[in-house]
From Swiss-Prot:
The lineage of its organism: Eukaryota, Fungi, Dikarya, Ascomycota, Saccharomycotina. One of its GO terms (molecular function) is rDNA binding. GO terms for cellular component: mitochondrion; nucleolus. This is Topoisomerase 1-associated factor 2. The keyword Phosphoprotein applies. Residues 275-294, 346-359, 640-652 have a biased composition (Polar residues). Present with 339 molecules/cell in log phase SD medium. InterPro entries: Dnt1-like_N, Net1/Tof2. It comes from Saccharomyces cerevisiae (strain ATCC 204508 / S288c) (Baker's yeast).
Length: 771
C-alpha cells in the first residue's frame, strides 16, 4: 500500500533567504533562552501523562525535532513575500518528481499569477541543499517543511485575490482537459539525470524548471466556452491542420478561377499548399502570377496572358500556360470533375454531378480539378481538329452574339469550353451539344449550322483528308478567326504564336456555348421512344408536335434562341411542353359506375315525356315535376294529382337528337323504368298532345285528372286530343344485371351486380271522349 507523505511547501524568494537563516540559528539555541517554548513543552508533557501515553521525554531527540519543526513553520508564516501551501505525495518519489509536482500545484492554486517561476533548489528546515536523486521519505518526515528556493521575487500586488468558488471552477475546467495537463507535465519532466549529473557541484541541486507563459496550460485555457473556442482558436491548431495537408509540387502552376461574379478576389495561401474548405471559409489558393514569382521563372508570355484575360468577355477565364503541368480550381454549381490528359490523346475523366435544384444560391459551389501535362511549346491541335474548327467558325452565323447566358447550364458550357481550349476531350459529358471528337463528320454534324455552307477556299474536302502541317493549319485557322471575328483589342500581341493560339481558343470556347443543329435533334428524337403511361394513354390532341425549323422538341428541349437554354423545371421563352395524361379521380369513377348500373332503367320523367310517341320521333316534351297524392286503400279510386299544373312548351327543331340519357333495354318500343315500387298503384295521368306540321314543333301538356272538365273546352277549339295513360301492376325479381350488349355488369372489384328485374309495364292510350 502506498503511503502518502504530508509536506508543507514554502516558496522562498531571494529576499527571504537571509531571514530564514537567522531564524534557523535562533531555533538551534538552548531551550532555556526562550521561556515561552519551555512553557509549551510542559503543557504537552502534562497532557500526555494524563492520557497515560508512553511518550518520550521532552529532552529526547525525536521530540525536540518535532517541536523545532513546528516552531520553524510557525515563524515562516510571518515572513514577507513567502507563500506556504500543503502538498501530498508518494514517499518513494524523488526530489526531482517533487519539484515538478510543486510547479503543477502552484499553477492550480494561483492561476492569476502570470509570471514564470524558476526553482533553484530544494532545502530542508535546516537550510541544507538537497540532491535531486534523494527519496522523499529518507529526507523529510511526515508533515515536514520543504523550502523551495526561487530565482525571482514573487510580486503578489499585481495579482487579484481569487475566491474558493473561482478556484473550484478553475479546477473543474482543468480536469476536463487531461490531454493538455499531461502534455505540460511531460514537458516539465524533460530534465534528465544526465543533465543534473553534468553540473560541477553534484552535492548541490540547481534545478531550473521554467513555467513559462507559452507552456502554461492554465493560460491556454482562458477561453471557457465552446463558442469562444470557435471565435478565438489557437494558432497551433491551424499549424497542425496545415501540416496534415499534402503539399503540391513546386513545379506546378496553380490557376484559380471562380465562376460566380460576386467573388472577384482570390485568397492567398502558403506556398505549395492548397486547402479545400467550406463556403464560410474561402479557400486560399495562390494565383498563377504569384506562383511564377515564387519559382523565380520570368516568362515573356505573362504580359500577354494578363492582356488577353482582361480583354476577354469571360473575366474569370484564364488560358493555359505552356511547358508546365497545370491545376485549375473552378467553383461551379453541382459539378465535380477531375480530368487528366496529355498531348498523346490519353484521356482520364472522372465526373460526379448532383441534380440541380430549382433555386441556386451563390454560396453553393463545388470544385473542379483539371491537370494537364504538356510537352510541346504549342497547343496539341491535330490536323483534323484544325479542319473541324475552321468549319465551325465559317458556319457560325453572324446574327448570334457572344453574350453570356444567365441560366443554370451556363456553368457547364463554360466548363466544357475551357476543356476544349486546353485540348481536353470530354468523354461522358452531360451536354451532347459540345463534342470534340477527332472525326470530322461527327464534329461537323454536332456544331455547324444548317443555314450556312462551308466555304471551299480555305479547306476543300481533298485537302482536309490529307495530313496538314501543324504550323500551316494553325496559321490558316488564325486567319479565318481574324476574318470572321475581328478583335481590335489584341493589337500587336497577335503577332506571337501564343497569342494566336489564345485567340483561337477564345473563339472556339464561345462557339461551344450554343445549341446543336437540327439534325442532332432529329436523331435524339428518333432514339428516344414515346413515353408510356400505363393504363391511361396519351390523347391525340395532347401529343407533342413534330420538330420544325423553328419549333421545340419534347425530348431535347432546345430552342432557336441561343440565349435561351432550359433544364429541369425552368421555363423558356416559348413556354414549356407538357404531356397531359388522362386522369380519373374517385368521384368520376363512382359516377361512371352508377351510370353503367342504371343503363337499362329510365326515370318517370322520361317515361311520360316519351309516352304515345313513335320510337324515332324527336322529343319535344319536358316534364318539369310530378306530384303524388295520398293513395286510398280502395283499388277502385286511385288518382294522381298535382298541386299546380306543370305546363311547358319548347320550340325545338325536329332534327335535334332525342333527349335520352343512355340507351336502355326496350320492349315494343317502350322504355323500362329505373325505380318503381314493388307493388305500384294504378295511376291516371292526362296527357294532351297537339298535332302540327312536321316543320313546326309539337307540344304536349300534362294536366291533372281533376282539371279534365276545364280543359275539354279548349280541346274542342284546337286540333288536340286527350290521351289517358294507364299503368298496370307487374312483378319483380332479382338477378344479375346486364349492359346494353347483354353482358353482365361488374363492379369495381370485378364482382357481378345483382339488381331487381321488373316486368315491362304496358301503357294504354285511350280518349276520354270515347269512354
Amino acid at each position: 500500500m502506498i503511503k502518502m507523505w504530508r509536506l508543507q511547501i514554502v516558496l522562498v524568494p531571494p529576499s527571504a533567504q537571509d531571514i530564514i537563516t537567522f531564524l534557523e540559528a535562533r531555533l538551534n539555541t538552548p531551550q532555556s533562552v526562550s521561556p515561552m517554548v519551555q512553557y509549551n513543552e510542559d503543557i504537552i508533557t502534562h497532557n500526555n501523562s494524563i492520557n497515560n501515553c508512553s511518550d518520550p521525554s521532552p529532552t529526547s531527540p525525536s521530540s525536540q525535532n518535532s517541536i523545532q519543526s513546528n516552531r520553524s513553520s510557525d515563524f515562516i508564516n510571518y515572513l514577507p513575500n513567502c507563500k506556504k501551501f500543503l502538498h501530498f505525495t508518494d514517499g518513494d518519489n524523488t526530489l526531482l518528481q517533487l519539484s515538478n509536482e510543486i510547479l503543477t500545484k502552484f499553477d492550480r492554486l494561483y492561476p492569476n499569477f502570470k509570471e514564470s517561476i524558476e526553482i533553484v533548489s530544494l532545502q530542508d528546515r535546516h537550510g541544507c541543499d538537497l540532491d535531486s536523486e534523494f527519496i522523499i521519505k529518507d529526507v523529510f518526515e511526515n508533515d515536514g517543511v520543504v523550502l523551495v528556493i526561487l530565482k525571482d521575487e514573487l510580486d503578489w500586488s499585481r495579482n487579484q485575490h481569487i475566491s474558493l468558488l473561482q478556484l473550484a471552477r478553475q479546477r473543474r475546467r482543468q480536469d476536463n482537459k487531461p490531454s493538455t495537463k499531461s502534455i505540460v507535465t511531460e514537458k516539465r519532466k524533460k530534465i534528465s539525470k544526465e543533465d543534473l549529473s553534468s553540473i560541477s557541484n553534484k552535492d548541490t541541486m540547481h534545478l531550473i524548471a521554467k513555467s513559462s507563459l507559452k507552456n502554461n496550460f492554465i493560460n491556454k485555457s482562458r477561453v471557457s466556452t465552446p463558442l469562444m473556442n470557435e471565435i478565438l482558436p489557437l494558432a497551433s491548431k491551424y499549424d497542425a491542420l496545415n501540416k496534415e495537408k499534402c503539399p503540391m509540387p513546386l513545379t506546378s502552376t496553380v490557376v484559380a478561377s471562380n465562376v460566380h461574379k460576386d467573388v472577384k478576389d482570390h485568397a492567398r495561401a502558403k506556398e505549395g499548399v492548397v486547402t479545400q474548405g467550406s463556403d464560410n471559409n474561402k479557400e486560399n489558393i495562390p494565383s498563377s502570377t504569384q506562383q511564377q514569382k515564387n519559382d523565380g521563372a520570368k516568362r515573356a508570355e505573362s504580359k500577354d496572358l494578363d492582356l488577353l484575360r482582361n480583354s476577354s468577355e469571360d473575366a474569370d477565364y484564364e488560358p493555359a500556360d505552356e511547358n508546365s503541368p497545370q491545376i485549375s480550381f473552378d467553383s461551379i454549381d453541382t459539378d465535380f470533375q477531375l480530368s487528366t490528359t496529355s498531348h498523346t490523346n490519353s484521356d482520364m475523366h472522372i465526373q460526379y454531378s448532383n441534380p440541380s435544384s430549382g433555386a441556386h444560391s451563390p454560396r453553393k459551389s463545388s470544385l473542379e480539378i483539371k491537370v494537364q501535362n504538356k510537352k510541346g511549346d504549342d497547343l496539341p491541335l491535330n490536323d483534323k481538329d484544325i479542319g473541324e474548327n475552321c468549319r465551325r467558325i465559317e458556319a457560325f452565323s453572324d446574327e448570334e452574339d457572344f453574350n453570356e447566358t444567365d441560366n443554370d447550364r451556363a456553368d457547364s458550357f463554360i466548363n466544357n469550353s475551357k476543356k476544349a481550349s486546353m485540348g481536353f476531350r470530354d468523354i461522358n459529358s452531360d451536354l451532347d451539344s459540345v463534342s470534340f471528337n477527332s472525326d470530322i463528320e461527327n464534329a461537323v454534324q454536332s456544331t455547324q449550322s444548317t443555314k450556312n455552307v462551308v466555304s471551299p477556299p480555305f479547306f476543300p474536302e481533298k485537302e482536309l483528308n490529307n495530313r496538314l502541317h501543324q504550323s500551316q493549319g494553325k496559321e490558316a485557322l488564325f486567319r479565318l478567326v481574324e476574318k470572321e471575328f475581328p478583335d481590335k483589342s489584341l493589337g500587336a500581341a497577335s503577332s506571337t504564336s501564343h497569342a494566336k493560339d489564345v485567340k483561337i481558343q477564345e473563339t472556339i470556347r464561345k462557339l461551344n456555348r450554343f445549341k446543336p443543329t437540327g439534325e442532332t435533334k432529329v436523331q435524339k428524337r428518333n432514339s428516344i421512344t414515346e413515353p408510356y403511361y400505363g393504363k391511361f394513354g396519351i390523347m391525340k390532341k395532347d401529343k407533342p408536335k413534330s420538330i420544325t425549323s423553328k419549333g421545340v422538341s419534347l425530348e431535347t428541349k432546345h430552342f432557336d434562341d441561343p440565349n435561351t437554354i432550359i433544364s429541369g423545371e425552368k421555363f423558356a421563352k416559348f413556354g414549356k411542353i407538357k404531356v397531359k395524361r388522362k386522369t380519373d379521380d374517385v368521384g368520376s369513377k363512382v359516377i361512371e359506375f352508377k351510370r353503367k348500373r342504371n343503363m337499362g332503367n329510365r326515370s318517370l320523367k322520361d317515361i311520360f315525356a316519351n309516352a304515345g310517341k313513335p320510337p324515332n320521333a324527336a322529343s319535344t316534351i319536358k316534364v318539369v315535376k310530378l306530384m303524388r297524392d295520398p293513395v286510398d286503400n280502395s283499388k277502385d279510386k286511385v288518382e294522381a294529382t298535382s298541386n299546380s299544373t306543370a305546363q311547358e312548351q319548347e320550340q325545338v327543331s325536329p332534327k335535334l337528337p332525342v333527349m335520352n340519357s343512355t340507351p336502355g333495354k326496350r320492349k315494343n318500343g317502350q322504355a323500362i323504368p329505373s325505380s318503381l315500387e314493388r307493388t305500384p298503384q294504378l295511376k291516371k295521368v292526362k296527357v294532351t298532345r297537339s298535332h302540327s306540321s312536321p316543320s313546326s314543333s309539337s307540344s304536349m301538356s300534362l294536366e291533372s285528372s281533376l282539371d279534365s272538365s276545364s280543359s275539354d273546352d279548349s280541346d274542342d277549339d284546337s286540333d288536340s286530343r286527350n290521351v289517358q295513360v294507364k299503368k298496370i301492376n307487374f312483378k319483380t325479381s332479382h338477378g344479375p344485371a346486364g349492359n346494353s350488349n347483354g353482358k353482365p355488369m361488374l363492379d369495381v372489384d370485378d364482382n357481378e351486380i345483382n339488381t331487381k328485374k321488373y316486368q315491362t309495364p304496358k301503357y294504354v292510350e285511350s280518349d276520354e271522349d270515347d269512354q
